[in-house]
Amino acid sequence: MTRQCTTILLLALISIAYTKLALAQAVWIPGWQQASEMNSARAGASVLQVKGVIYAIGGINGHDFLNTTEYSKINADGMLAPWKRSAILNDARGFFDAVEHNGFIYAAGGGKGENGKILLRSVERTRISESGALEGWVTERYRMQYPRRCVKLFVANERLYALGGFAGTLLDSVESAPINKDGSLGRWRNETNPLTMTRYINSVKSLNGFAYVIGGHAENEGVGLTEVEFTQLSIDDELVWKKTMPMQTPRYGLSSGTHGNQLYAIGGLNGARYSDKIEVTQQADDGELGEWRYTTPLSSMRANFGSVVYDSHIYIIGGTNRDGYYKTAEYASLDTHGDIGFWGTQQQLEDYQQQQQAKLSKPKRKLPNSGMVAEVIQTKAYSYIRVQKGVTEQWIAGSRELFNVGDLIEYSRGTTMANFHSSTLNRTFDSIIFVEHLRLVD
């Protein structure tokens, strides 16, 4: 028995020594690792984490708005277990929000139908079972005061708050409903204090007794916002909003995350251009935010995805960009400085560096459209360009670039808007295409 104990102790010491050696030889890699894929591609879904389980609810797959849900348990090493399907929503919905409180998940607002034109006021509730699966969804008796596509939610003082979004016009209003002891919601009321500005396709996160509203879509121009505002979640229900340190990058369709006293703004769009940039800031005791700084970017530019943080890991779920809709899941660690990456071997670092170099040296892909610049109108955020293509002409708009009449340019596919009115220019275009990329022909 003594010899057996000695052997076990020796093996334990060897294991500890090996682990310490491996950690000493590990290198920090500023990148992302692949995790288990979802069953369905999803953008505009609601993604949240509850007790080590990630839930992906609703969204759009590029063709249809979804009523399906799925979930995955986070393993001890940060990897995700295979995704499992769970209870379906009563209403297919995308560009909505969902939050958890006391074992219930609440899903509110959003849109459905062609281009999300059917705006939703309804709220659904489900209970999380002991296995992590969702039980059947129940549609709440009381609906929100306003339909809100791209609504954002948070819980404070046993009330569910809904803010911003689109109801035929962009909203700055806030409303809330009491959460009853059985999990059901009471009647919604409009809050006295609105946001400091309209908010649409923005992000919201609660952090250490404060709620933050981050970015969004500018009301008078199709660009992102840098503005951030916050409120203290006081016990008297009176929420007063004020602005704090803005981000460096304007963005809408972004996601966000929190870790400790750090707040992250992730990806999104500015104009028609997708972003892979991630910024991080630190929260002060009074809720004010410090200067934002850049950290490791996403593995690809994307918007309308989900992000969650659990322990020291951050996860990116689904989303979309010009290449399509994603069912991928990626994860990374957060170090003591708040930077994003993972610990790996020297070989993994070299492989990562080669991959990044290959991206930079990859030849530019020829864009599908081209023409000659016939007219240019510049605004702070956009270049509006009348392009001559043989005997036809087309107005396009993209992120501000310096072009001259007579230049030959090429540009990507985009989103065509009929009877588009630019408030900045006080002008209506019969037809205009918003494009992500435009450049001079080499």
Model-predicted regions and their roles:
Residues 1-8:
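Bacterial N-terminal signal peptides that target proteins for export
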Residues 8-17:
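Bacterial N-terminal signal peptides
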Residues 20-356:
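Kelch-like beta-propeller repeat domains
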Residues 364-379:
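Structural detector for short beta-strands of small beta-barrel domains
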Residues 380-386:
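Short aromatic-glycine-enriched beta-strand elements
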Residues 392-402:
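Beta-strand/loop nucleic-acid-binding surfaces
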Residues 406-422:
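Flexible glycine-rich surface loops and low-complexity tracts that mediate binding to linear polymers
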Residues 426-442:
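Short peripheral tails and domain-boundary helices/loops at the edges of structured domains
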